[in-house]
Amino acid sequence: MVTITNAHTELIHDAVLDYYGKRLATCSSDKTIQIFEVDGDSHKLVDSLHGHEGPVWQVDWAHPKFGVILASCSYDGKVLIWKEENGRWSQIAAYEVHSASVNSVKWAPHEYGPLLLCSSSDGKFSVVEFKENGTTSPIIIDAHAIGVNAACWAPATIEDDGQQSQHLRRIATGGADNLVKIWKYNPEANTYLLEDTLAAHADWVRDVAWSPSVLPRAYLATVSQDRTCIIWTQENNQGPWTKTLLKEDKFPDVLWRASWSLSGNILALSGGDNKVTLWKENLEGKWESAAEIEQ
C-alpha cells in the first residue's frame, strides 16, 4: 500500500490510478491536480497541474488507446483535459457548458470512442465527444432539478434487435432529489432517454457505481447522505431493477464514494468516518464485509 502525505495543502477529494497502475492523479480543494509515478511501495511527484479556479472534485484517466490523457472537474464549472507527451503535461482542452459546479467526470468504455460524461449542480449531465479535428459535440440532458451529484457508465455491451447489433450505451445518475436514474442512448435522436427511476434513498445520492462485470446480471451500487448503500440488480439489461440493502443497519457516517474492483465482484465504500470497507456477495446472495481499512 502506498501512503502519500503532503501532496496538497487542503482536502483531497479524489485519487485515481491509471490503466496500468503506474500513475496516480490526485485532486484537492487547493485547486490543483498532482501527478505521481508509482512503483511498488514508492512514489514520485512528477507534475502539478494548475488551471482550475475552485476546488477540484474528481479526475479520470482516459483509456491508453487515446494517449496519456486525464480529465478533471471543479466547482468553477469547468472540465479540463490534460495530456502528457514526452514527459511534459499540458492542458489541451477546456469544456464549459455547465452553469454550476461540475461534480463528476467519467470517460466512457473505450469501445464508444472518446466520450466524457459530466454531472453538474445545474441539474444536468452532459456527454461530450472529442473529435479528431479538435471540436467537441456535447449532448446535454436535464436530469435532476436540484443537482446531479454523480454519474457513471454501464460496461460496454452489445444489443441485438434482430436486424443489427449495436452498442447499448447506458448511464446512471444520482441526484440531490434522492433519486437514481437510468438513461439509454437513442442513436436516431442522438440523445439519452430516461429508462428507469430508482427511488429508495432518503437523502442526497452521493455516488453511483456500475459493476464492470459482463455477466447477464447488472449490478449498480448507490450510496447516500442517508448512510446507506443499495445494490440494484437487473437481469439481461431489461426488466425491473431489484433493490438490496448492503447491510440492514446504517453506516456510522455519510457515504461519499463507491468503487468496484476490475472483476466487478468486490465493492469498496468510503465515507465520513475515514474508513474504506470492502464487500463481497456470498453464494446465498448476501453481502458480507471482506475487509476494513482505516485511513
UniProtKB/Swiss-Prot annotation:
InterPro entries: Sec13/Seh1_fam (IPR037363), WD40/YVTN_repeat-like_dom_sf (IPR015943), WD40_repeat_dom_sf (IPR036322), WD40_rpt (IPR001680). WD repeats lie at residues 7-46, 51-92, 97-140, 143-193, 200-242, 250-289. This is Protein transport protein SEC13. It is found in: Cytoplasmic vesicle, COPII-coated vesicle membrane; Endoplasmic reticulum membrane; Nucleus, Nuclear pore complex. Belongs to the WD repeat SEC13 family. The keyword Signal does not apply. GO terms for molecular function: structural molecule activity. The lineage of its organism: Eukaryota, Fungi, Dikarya, Ascomycota, Saccharomycotina. GO terms for cellular component: COPII vesicle coat; endoplasmic reticulum membrane; GATOR2 complex; nuclear pore outer ring. Component of the coat protein complex II (COPII) which promotes the formation of transport vesicles from the endoplasmic reticulum (ER). The coat has two main functions, the physical deformation of the endoplasmic reticulum membrane into vesicles and the selection of cargo molecules. It also functions as a component of the nuclear pore complex (NPC). NPC components, collectively referred to as nucleoporins (NUPs), can play the role of both NPC structural components and of docking or interaction partners for transiently associated nuclear transport factors. Keywords: Cytoplasmic vesicle, Endoplasmic reticulum, ER-Golgi transport, Membrane, mRNA transport, Nuclear pore complex, Nucleus, Protein transport, Repeat, Translocation, Transport, WD repeat. SUPFAM superfamilies: WD40 repeat-like (SSF50978). It comes from Eremothecium gossypii (strain ATCC 10895 / CBS 109.51 / FGSC 9923 / NRRL Y-1056) (Yeast). Disulfide bonds: none annotated. It is a peripheral membrane protein. One of its GO terms (biological process) is ERAD pathway. The COPII coat is composed of at least 5 proteins: the SEC23/24 complex, the SEC13/31 complex, and the protein SAR1. Component of the nuclear pore complex (NPC). NPC constitutes the exclusive means of nucleocytoplasmic transport. NPCs allow the passive diffusion of ions and small molecules and the active, nuclear transport receptor-mediated bidirectional transport of macromolecules such as proteins, RNAs, ribonucleoparticles (RNPs), and ribosomal subunits across the nuclear envelope. Due to its 8-fold rotational symmetry, all subunits are present with 8 copies or multiples thereof. Pfam families: WD40.
